[in-house]
């Protein structure tokens, strides 16, 4: 039998441990931000399921700024798979960041957003807010977006291809002459027809932009519209196809490689309007503390949104214009004319079917897009 003094010490230790655990949970879920100090910390657990190119770098920088402005809050960022997020045994974090196609049942994971979370001072673009809306409830707050462009290898048209501008130390494309008013050359159809692989593209939303750019299709490979975005990018980088649909993040990354001597000269084509699924959204879960809403509001603020330009990403705010030249300026200008964002919670098969039918001229653009909004 244990001596009486050992039992007393063990009991006291258990009581102290339970008290500390209860104190931590209370502070995590109940303490208002105004009462937090450096000694009373609130922890925000953030999961990123997916991100546009440059999104993680922007987010990490903004989280550091957010913590400096709110000394009582610490953030913890983790990258997870969509499967891990939706597994029934998963203990959900406080905030989840994701892209269209990652989540199909938002009501099972997230709380509807209200107040500043749903619309930051009424300055968020409605087209992007609709992307995070499901059954008339706003579940996802758009944080930034990218688009789809068509990249064309210089091997097809050496005289027209250009080497992208050098990048700065931060990775942002350096300033170039504004070409937004200069008509883009047409797609080099005849030259593409002579290539072993004329064109590659992912399926789904990329096909909408591709259809707007092509007056006539070149010969399509057997794997057309079946590869992932990353696989298409790799094929273009290895010169296994002479033209390819890339995300703007991929296009900016490849421009950096080219200016550094690792890529090759090429040009890009942008459509006169933007149809995209490259939207980064944030949602809060049921047990999230009040600081989660504060973080979302901060990420949609003008201060945080202006910093998107360092990564070639686009703002979700109506009152900001970030670019004067280059790829990003062309895309931003097109979005001011017309912007459509595919609903985030639709099954990928639904988007693929509509885009494929439009690509082959079986339905009109309006018929394809309206069910996807």
Where are these regions (language model features)?
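Short glycine- and hydrophobic/aromatic-rich loop-to-beta-strand nucleating segment
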Residues: 148-152, 282-283
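Extracytoplasmic/periplasmic solute-binding protein
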Residues: 139-144, 148, 161-218, 241
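Conserved N-terminal structural module of periplasmic/extracytoplasmic solute-binding proteins
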Residues: 1-100, 373
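C-terminal capping/gating helix-and-loop segments adjacent to ligand/active sites or protein-protein/ligand interfaces
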Residues: 2, 6-7, 309-373
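Hinge/lid segment of periplasmic solute-binding proteins
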Residues: 99-149, 160, 180-191
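Bilobed periplasmic-binding protein/Venus flytrap-like ligand-binding cleft at the lobe interface
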Residues: 280-315
């Amino acid at each position: 039998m244990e001596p009486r003094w050992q039992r007393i010490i063990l009991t006291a230790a258990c009581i102290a441990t339970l008290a500390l655990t209860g104190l931590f949970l209370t502070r995590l879920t109940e303490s208002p931000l105004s009462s937090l100090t450096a000694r009373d910390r609130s922890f925000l657990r953030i999961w990123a399921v997916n991100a546009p190119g440059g999104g993680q770098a922007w987010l990490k920088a903004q989280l550091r700024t957010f913590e400096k402005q709110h000394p009582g809050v610490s953030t913890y960022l983790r990258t997870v798979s969509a499967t891990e997020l939706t597994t029934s045994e998963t203990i959900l974090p406080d905030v989840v960041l994701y892209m269209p196609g990652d989540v199909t049942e938002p009501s099972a994971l997230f709380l509807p957003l209200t107040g500043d979370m749903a619309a930051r001072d009424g300055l968020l673009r409605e087209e992007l807010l609709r992307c995070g809306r499901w059954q008339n409830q706003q579940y996802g707050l758009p944080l930034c977006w990218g688009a789809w462009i068509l990249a064309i290898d210089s091997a097809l048209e050496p005289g027209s291809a250009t080497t992208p501008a050098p990048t700065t130390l931060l990775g942002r494309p350096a300033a170039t002459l504004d070409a937004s008013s200069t008509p883009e050359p047409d797609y080099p159809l005849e030259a593409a027809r002579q290539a072993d692989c004329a064109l590659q593209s992912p399926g789904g939303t990329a096909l909408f932009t591709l259809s707007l750019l092509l007056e006539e299709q070149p010969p399509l490979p057997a794997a057309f519209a079946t590869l992932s975005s990353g696989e298409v990018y790799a094929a273009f980088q290895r010169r296994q196809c002479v033209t390819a649909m890339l995300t703007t993040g991929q296009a900016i990354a490849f421009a950096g490689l080219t200016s550094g001597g690792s890529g090759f000269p090429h040009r890009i084509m942008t459509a006169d309007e933007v149809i995209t699924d490259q939207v980064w959204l944030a949602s809060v879960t049921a047990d999230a503390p009040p600081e989660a809403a504060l973080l979302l509001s901060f990420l949609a603020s003008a201060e945080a949104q202006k910093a998107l330009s360092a990564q070639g990403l686009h703002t979700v705010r109506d009152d900001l214009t970030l670019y004067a030249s280059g790829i990003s300026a062309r895309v931003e200008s097109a979005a001011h004319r017309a912007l459509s964002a595919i609903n985030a919670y639709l099954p990928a098969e639904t988007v693929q079917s509509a885009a494929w039918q439009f690509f082959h001229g079986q339905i009109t653009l309006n018929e394809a897009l309206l069910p996807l909004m």
